[in-house]
């Protein structure tokens, strides 16, 4: 993507430096994910699976990154590409090879974990109310008019509680209701 900017190159570099200094944990996570890419790309019979995180939710192994629900984030054909002036990791995608780096892995992991959390919440919500639609991180349910307050409270309670494997994760929810999705 290209963005028009009136900032000088020096100012842009300064802003990047400030971001990296203030958000050192983010940068460290990017580096851990770069290392995971390296390990997955060079996996051999002597390699040992290991957890990417302190909570033992994300297992780096030959197959990719194993998520808490047992599914994997997999980068088929992952390799270190040295064909251009700047080397990079690439993997086979639908339309050829796509480059990837630690920050991209973080984005993929965050999106996958968010989807797992919402999916688990939907299973719990389904015990009392019928989810009929999801939009990003929103769950749309149907409830009787005289049960809207109870339904809202139940759904907020469920969606504001992190799963056991993510204890301490700040999750929150707000609820709206109307006669149709467009009214919310």
Mark where each language-model region is:
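Conserved catalytic core of nucleotide polymerization and phosphodiester-bond processing enzymes
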Residues: 1-184
